UniProtKB/Swiss-Prot annotation:
Species lineage: Eukaryota, Metazoa, Spiralia, Lophotrochozoa, Platyhelminthes
UniProt superkingdom: Eukaryota
Matching SMART domains: 14_3_3
Family the entry assigns: Belongs to the 14-3-3 family.
Gene3D superfamilies, A to Z: 14-3-3 domain
SUPFAM superfamilies on file: 14-3-3 protein
InterPro entries: 14-3-3, 14-3-3_CS, 14-3-3_dom_sf, 14-3-3_domain
Listed Pfam families: 14-3-3
Full protein name: 14-3-3 protein homolog 1
Length: 244
């Protein structure tokens, strides 16, 4: 990860929010993550806007590395046993050495030891975030490390799901996003397509019956995630039918 923008605790939350927004507009996501990390370290509960900035920043910082890793992993499999195999493995390792510390950086944020003091929506958001970043670790790890990250991802997602089912409407974008990512976890990490389909279908079916009640401010986000759930179900459908 490139050097994050220098932010200090003396910066106010408002200054950090504005800096993060400017960095996002400039697509300087390392700078955005630096501002958001400082904000998270100030000890105050982040509001909805601040949490979303944090999520967007690290998602984009990590996104390019995850894409690179997937490409290099595919190339490495094709080149196994060829003269280029060693060079490809070295490059794949380099990408992993950038990707893993970013995940660990997120998981070490002081907001993630989740306390009873924060609201239900914030708890769900952070448990989901933990589940996502442990999943990203599991994608690139092997052996015991993979087992630990997989277990931690599943545990965090289950906690988030239990809270979401009790506290959020079936059309809430955080609840839908959680269902989307948890189903991807079962499909890609645990190799359980039937479980992935069941989870995604339940979330989509519940939301579609309430689609007319979605609030205007969340309509775009909610319907986009519903479309992603449906796209995955279409993609996974043949495997789910085979496993049934």
């Amino acid at each position: 990860m490139s050097r994050l923008a220098e932010c200090t605790i003396s910066d106010t939350v408002d200054e950090l929010v504005q800096r993060a927004k400017l960095a996002e507009q400039a697509e300087r996501y390392d700078d955005m993550a630096g501002a958001c990390k400082t904000m998270a370290e100030m000890g105050n509960e982040l509001n909805n806007e601040e949490r979303n900035l944090l999520s967007v920043a690290y998602k984009n910082v990590l996104g390019a590395r995850r894409s690179s890793w997937r490409i290099m992993s595919s190339i490495a499999k094709k080149q196994a046993g060829t003269p280029l195999a060693d060079q490809t493995d070295i490059y794949l390792k380099k990408v992993e050495e950038e990707l893993i510390p970013i995940c660990n950086d997120v998981l070490a944020l002081p907001v993630l030891p989740i306390t009873e003091k924060i609201g239900a929506e914030a708890k769900i958001f952070y448990y989901k975030m933990m589940g996502d970043y442990y999943r990203y670790l599991a994608e690139v790890q092997e052996g015991e490390q993979n087992d630990k990250s997989t277990e931690a991802a599943e545990e965090a997602n289950q906690k988030a799901t239990s809270l979401a089912e009790a506290e959020l409407s079936v059309t809430h974008p955080i609840r839908l996003g959680l269902a989307l990512n948890f189903s991807v976890f079962y499909y890609e990490i645990k190799n359980m397509p039937e479980k992935a389909c069941s989870l995604a279908k339940a979330a989509f079916d519940a939301a579609i019956t309430e689609v007319d009640s979605i609030k205007d401010e969340t309509y775009k986000d909610s319907t986009l995630i519903m479309q992603l759930l449906r796209d995955n179900l279409t993609l996974w459908n043949s495997e789910c039918e085979t496993d049934s």
